[in-house]
């Protein structure tokens, strides 16, 4: 609802809303932003049995202030989580390596599909616990088209413009990744 005190399921076909956003850089201090709520069929492409339906936080994001322990004490997990979680980084933390920040991004935004059995149709795996060679990301050819890029790779070392991953994330419309919610 408009007061944001209750949520309702979007119509089966999805719907579009226009919001007025405060923005000091826009004429008059506001701008309009259109948001499309996905259809249920679109939602089910990611929220499915392979992903355990819920796509929210990743356990490594909760390794702070005893959050995992609190949730386990409240019986929020069907089975205990492993004590050791993969290391993730704040993307803005310049003291973390670019490698760790990039792998963190892929873990949190891509690995729910781009993993064995996860539904992603590409052969690469984005899980942070794999060593980089095992992910088949760097200097591996794409399996879902090259977007017209000569000698494209999923990630082309030292040449982001020949990297399908970069181009799909930067793209609007068909071929964009992720397909929805961005």
Question: For the regions a protein language model found, what residue spans apply to each?
Answer:
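Electron-transfer interface patches adjacent to heme c in soluble/periplasmic c-type cytochromes
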Residues: 66-102, 112-117, 125-182
């Amino acid at each position: 609802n408009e007061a944001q005190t209750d949520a309702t399921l979007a119509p089966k076909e999805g719907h579009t809303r226009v919001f007025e956003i405060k923005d000091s850089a826009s004429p008059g201090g506001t701008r309009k932003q259109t948001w499309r709520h996905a259809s249920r069929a679109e939602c089910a492409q990611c929220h499915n049995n392979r992903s355990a339906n819920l796509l929210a936080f990743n356990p490594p994001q909760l390794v702070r202030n005893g959050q995992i322990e609190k949730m386990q004490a409240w019986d929020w997990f069907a089975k205990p989580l492993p004590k050791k979680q993969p290391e993730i980084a704040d993307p803005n933390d310049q003291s973390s390596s670019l490698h760790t920040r990039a792998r963190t991004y892929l873990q949190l935004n891509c690995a729910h599909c781009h993993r064995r059995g996860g539904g992603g149709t590409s052969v690469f795996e984005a899980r942070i616990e794999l060593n980089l060679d095992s992910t088949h990301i760097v200097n591996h050819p794409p399996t879902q088209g090259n977007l017209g890029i000569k000698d494209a790779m999923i990630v082309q070392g030292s040449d982001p413009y020949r990297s399908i991953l970069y181009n799909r994330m930067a793209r609007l419309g068909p071929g964009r990744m992720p397909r929805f919610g961005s």
